[in-house]
Swiss-Prot record:
The modification Phosphothreonine is found at T39. Residues 703-720 have a biased composition (Acidic residues). This is Heat shock protein homolog pss1. It comes from the Eukaryota. One of its GO terms (biological process) is protein refolding. The lineage of its organism: Eukaryota, Fungi, Dikarya, Ascomycota, Taphrinomycotina. Induction: Increases a few-fold upon upshift to 42 degrees Celsius. Residues 658-690 have a biased composition (Basic and acidic residues).
Amino acid sequence: MSSRTNVVGIDFGNSKTVIAVARNRAIDVIVNEVSNRSTPSLVSYGERSRFLGEAAKSAEASNFRNTVGSLKRLAGRTYDDPEIKDIESNFISAKLTEVDGFVGAKVQYLNEETAFSNIQLIAAYFTKIKAIAEAELIGSVSDVVISIPAWFTDIQRRALLEAANIAGLNPLRLMNDNAAAALTYGITKTDLPEPESPRRVAIVDFGHSNYSVSIVEFSRGQFHIKSTVCDRNLGSRNMDKALIDYFAAEFKEKYKIDVLSNPKATFRLATAVERLKKVLSANANAPLNVEMIMNDIDASSFIKRSDFEELIKPLLERLTPPIEKALELAGIKKEDLYSIEMVGGCTRVPIVKEVIANYFGKGLSFTLNQDEAVARGCALSCAILSPVFRVREFHVHDVTTYPITFSWEPIPENPEEDSSLEVFSEGNPIPSTKILTFYRKAPFKLLAAYSKEAQLPGSIKQNIAQYLINDVVPNKDGDLSIVKIKVRLDLHGILVVEQAYIVEEQEVEEPVETSPEEEAEKKTDEPVKMRKVKKLVKVADLSVSVQEDRLPTEVLEKYREAEHQMIATDKLVAETVDRKNALEEYIYDTRAKLDDIYAPFTNEEESSKFKEMLTKAEDWLYEEGEDTTKAVYTAKLEDLMRVGGPIRQRYLDAEEAKRQKVQAEREAAKAATKSEAEKQKPSGKFEEGTGGRAPPPPPAEEVAPENEEVETMEIDEQKE
């Protein structure tokens, strides 16, 4: 398959990631190397290589200090961000540190202490996601759409883009996860109303670390996000934390151990709690057992679902305020909603469903796949954006979460001039372009910033970027030039100054508009009437210098080179392990066959020498050959195969001779059967009076009943 036909959607989750692909007129979810439909969002660093995804999950228990999760929560953040220090550090077992001005993780990699930035960590994980997709599609993957939380800021979105680019991916769009779920819902509906009376739907997404509510209006061929409200730090991991603290307090009293003071014990308890919570979703109570939690103690306990629900009551109280706010921003009442669509793994918790259903006063809808709806929406979006896919037309109208204001210094010629303007308001469509007009005679600066600092996550800076508009000069009369600046919120939700230029008012000629009657009366050879009008005409492009709080190009290039080197190292280690396993398998397999199927094809002396050779290779493999290079394992295997190859070939030749003999016997039997069947057929000879056809079989002879007279008739047959 050509790489250009591979369109992939990635739901980059906090605990796991789902990959979907558009193919064969459908959206399929891709399974990973262990046939799971989702891949743990983990990267782990070892003595010889990295472990990514499922491999990182397997290594986590013994290597948790060098394993990093909650990857997307680190994107674009600084080390001193209070949400990093006070919240994320509780969910990440690796040591967090500052790397190139942003938060990263310090781990032991290749037996050395190494620090990786959040961009490097995410890029490492994306290389695994890319490899999973390519293995399934049997071709390269580049164009993707990646989901992000709607509350991600400009710098967080840029960090994710940079990580994806380092991993060799080309994101066509960073898509807000609520919009992706809405696309999955809407594009399959054939009964959507006209735009005049849209269908209003609430999409409630309750995932591992984030809770969001969107009010969406669906109509034929499109949807509009009317509002999105998030609780950035509410998710299933908060429920896990409540259970961990509960059982840790119980074990402190019951076993006199302080689980929370021991990272390994805390990890073991967290693993057990995750299993327990799943049991509680389907049962009224659940046991908890943790073997060797610490100090050689096997800890056990028990909890009722009702006690669990009481334990997380403070979390449940946070479910309705975002719903109320979303309805308020959308300007509708809950009674106006057609349905409430539930997305995210945490929506399986019975008490969560109960609280939300009670607020709306109606049943909840689970028509969307809670785990896969966002990934499917991303794949659909990628197909829509791809020039090689034909998808039913469906327009996505997403909105920005944070308003953006531009500010500038007033000029001496106009000191009363406004010095700021909110260019993109809250709920402004994405993508969106605005043109700002200034009157200047010299270069000037523009500052883009979020309008409301209190809305931003953690210590994300309010300022987005500063733009220096260069090359501005007075107009030909020595007066102020008219400067136009085109600013855009692109498909990723990232702010871009696309163009700056000077315009002048010039007198130009344009055709005079005529009525249809005048057009009909006009003679063919009559010249077109023109009139002179004054219009703004672009006369010069201006260069724009940008100052952003982002990593320099040379640092990103260093990350790219480091990632390529680590990919090569991972590949070499994997191939070395493969050769070692192949050698081990050959030793055991061949030795068993020498006493079995290979026995008739070797003599005692040859067999004895070869067995001795295999035993020596086995001893070497578990001693000095325990840790060596790919080339050495390959050479050892080739040495053994040179001796064992002739024996194996004699066996294969004999098997082939048997096969041919059986085949010949079958063909002979088949031929004999066919010959016998031919003999049983009618002769097929033509006879006179039959019109060139074989004569029909003779009629059955009738036997007259007793005492019945039989009349014999003779027919003279007329020949042709």
